[in-house]
Swiss-Prot record:
It comes from the Bacteria. It is an enzyme of class 4 (lyase). This is Tryptophan synthase alpha chain. NCBIfam families: trpA (TIGR00262). It catalyses: (1S,2R)-1-C-(indol-3-yl)glycerol 3-phosphate + L-serine = D-glyceraldehyde 3-phosphate + L-tryptophan + H2O. Pfam families: Trp_syntA. Gene3D superfamilies: Aldolase class I. Tetramer of two alpha and two beta chains. PROSITE patterns: TRP_SYNTHASE_ALPHA. Keywords: Amino-acid biosynthesis, Aromatic amino acid biosynthesis, Lyase, Tryptophan biosynthesis. CDD domains: Tryptophan_synthase_alpha. Coiled coil: none annotated. Pathway: Amino-acid biosynthesis; L-tryptophan biosynthesis; L-tryptophan from chorismate: step 5/5.
Length: 267
C-alpha cells in the first residue's frame, strides 16, 4: 500500500482526479466492511476513507450518523476497525484514511493511538473536530511515523485561515463543499469553484472536495473545476446499507465504477 502523498503524486503524473469513497466501519458488520474495502479498491477507488463509528458525530449527516449508530449498537470499537484494516491493507492498492473524531485519540494518547493505527496499515487521518489551533499536537508526531493528517477547509473560512490550513495540512486538503453536515445534495454549489480558485492560489497541495457529492455528474463537475480528488460518503453509505449485505456490496461496486468512469470523461 502506498502513502497518501505518493498516491496523489502518481495520479498527478497521469493527470487523473482521485476517487475517494467513504464507508462506515462495522455497518452492516465487520465482515462486510472487509469485503467492501476490497471491492472498492477493485472498482476504481484511489484512496478509501473509513469512518470510525462515534456516538456524537457532529460533522455527519443523518445517513452516516445512522450507520455509526448501527455499528455502535453491535459493539464495534476502534480496535475492531483496526483489525479489519490490518487484515485488508496488505491486499489492496488504495491507501486507507481513517475518519475519526478526536476523543478516541485523546483517550488513548496521541503517541499510542498513532502507533496503533500505523501498525494496522492506516496511511492517513481526517479528524473533523480538530481545530487548526490544536492541530500541531497531532500533525508533528503523525508525520514522524508516516501518517498524513488532512485538515478541513470550511466554505466560510476567511482567506487567512485557508492559507494557514493549506500550509499545515498533510497528504491533501479536504475542502468541505457546503456549510453544515455531510449528506447528499441535489447539486454542488458554484461557491466550490471559487474556493478551489482561492485555495489553488495559496498552495500546490492536492485538494479534495467532499460533503454533498452524490452523483457521477457531481464528481465530473468538481473535477472540471480543478479538484484533485472527489470524496463520496453518504451516497456510498446509503447504498451499502440497503438490502442484504450482498446487495449492498453489489450496489457500491457499481456506483464506484460509475463515479470512476465519470472522472475519466473529458470536459
Amino acid at each position: 500500500m502506498t502513502s497518501v502523498s505518493d498516491c496523489f503524486q502518481s495520479l498527478r503524473d497521469r493527470r487523473q482526479c482521485a476517487l475517494i469513497p467513504f464507508i462506515t466501519a462495522g455497518d452492516p458488520d465487520l465482515e462486510t466492511t472487509a469485503k467492501a474495502l476490497r471491492l472498492l479498491d477493485a472498482s476504481g477507488a484511489d484512496l478509501i476513507e473509513l469512518g470510525v463509528p462515534y456516538s456524537d458525530p457532529l460533522a455527519d449527516g443523518p445517513v452516516i450518523q445512522a450507520a455509526a449508530t448501527r455499528a455502535l449498537g453491535r459493539g464495534v470499537k476502534l480496535e475492531d476497525v483496526l483489525g479489519v484494516v490490518k487484515e485488508v491493507s496488505p491486499e489492496i492498492k488504495a491507501p486507507i484514511i481513517l475518519f475519526t473524531y478526536y476523543n478516541p485519540i485523546f483517550y488513548r494518547g496521541v503517541e499510542a493511538f498513532l502507533q496503533q493505527v500505523k501498525a494496522a496499515g492506516v496511511q492517513g487521518l481526517v479528524v473533523p473536530d480538530l481545530p487548526l489551533e490544536e492541530a500541531e499536537s497531532l500533525l508533528k508526531p503523525a508525520h514522524e511515523v508516516g501518517i498524513a493528517v488532512t485538515l478541513l477547509v470550511a466554505p466560510t473560512s476567511p482567506i487567512e485561515r485557508i492559507e494557514a490550513i493549506a500550509r499545515q495540512s498533510q497528504g491533501f486538503i479536504y475542502l468541505v463543499s457546503v456549510t453544515g453536515v455531510t449528506g447528499m445534495r441535489s447539486q454542488v454549489t458554484s461557491r466550490v469553484k471559487e474556493l478551489l480558485t482561492s485555495l489553488r492560489s495559496a498552495t500546490d497541495k492536492p485538494i479534495g472536495v467532499g460533503f454533498g457529492i452524490s452523483k457521477p455528474e457531481h464528481a465530473l463537475q468538481v473535477k472540471n473545476w480543478g479538484a484533485d480528488a472527489v470524496i463520496v460518503g453518504s451516497a456510498m453509505v446509503k447504498r451499502l446499507a440497503e438490502g442484504t449485505p450482498e446487495e449492498g456490496l453489489k450496489a457500491i461496486g457499481a456506483f464506484c465504477q460509475d463515479l470512476k468512469q465519470a472522472l475519466k470523461e473529458d470536459q
